[in-house]
């Protein structure tokens, strides 16, 4: 019996149990009372609408389930950012569905709500996927309006994207199933087709109370902007539905008539499960992020038939590169090796660290994948680039810059999985969020930060100690230990996968066994968008 394997397995399964528990809580939205209120109005919830709309026999993945987690407690919270975003299939067509959750502050927009909607549109644009908006929102959450209204990546960007997607020929369908007010009223009208549900859907720039205050006119909301008004008088909407299900049925019929998209042509054959048991990942992945392990053991439990054709196997060993398949799709894998390795020259290299040779290898491999039009999968467990005089004299900065250049300029779809550490410039070199991965997800074990908690706490402690000394105060060993523990606790909270997911630094926190489905759905989505730009590394320092 392998005691370490069993210890790891128990720890990881317990962490995943916590993940499922937190997901269940998030999916309750604004709570049972608000859900009952919706039902009493004859309306379905956001999640019920999506469940009814999507094909039951096809997979689906949810984007940003933890968005807003712990960010707005003073305002009563904002589960899932008050909007549910799912990539799934409607009438056999892969698409993005965005549904306002009216159980959360009547679907009002928090700052993170805008960010999540923009992420949904970004996914649709990058992959040329149809996008369906299920609208039921009271508009901007006024107490936080200064954080959502005027800036480039705020609320207004959504309508800019509406216009841009329309010009790109990306199908947009909007269904108004509740309130659609103020600036939000433009969204359905800027879509290709707009449906509205009779008696529950309404669209207006200003509601009846504001109209009364502004111009003295007395009018009720239904007459002002209900389904009959907009389908028979203003011509703003195209179809009137009797209820939520009737509207969603019409969307399904519309989606069924869409032409098939032109494909990028990424290679796919019949899918096969890994020969090695994927469940063993739980025992391989260490409890502590500082412990070494062989990343190849993880890869062989993720790829079809457990076949990984390694590129430059004996060179630059702290990064693994090679070709494989996931659910039949060809992929090029770039992964951090976490065990200590020994070079042919006898040099010992730390796992999870990027050295000059591994940076060179990864750069060349990324170029090869662009040449062959093979999507890239980055498996992150990186603590950064190697430091010290030997590395500096050897040109680690220019070698790292080449890798960052290759990642930034890559034109094939990129996908990132944060398995463990994702620290500092290593995050950039391994295709962090700033480098436009089509999807970026974290396992429960992922940590995203400038550096590890212990190291950061030591640096911050030194700064705090120096500040106290300037004031003439001295730290006793006991106070120093207490201050260190306090700083580390704060920092550890900020590097947790939940902190990152709440801010949409990642699209989701997933069970390792869900990785294959996420990558496969991501590549299938990317296959709808032919590559239009040539791969060009630009100027590099050799």
Q: Which stretches of residues belong to each language-model region?
A:
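Ligand-binding clefts of soluble mixed alpha/beta catalytic domains
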Residues: 1-542
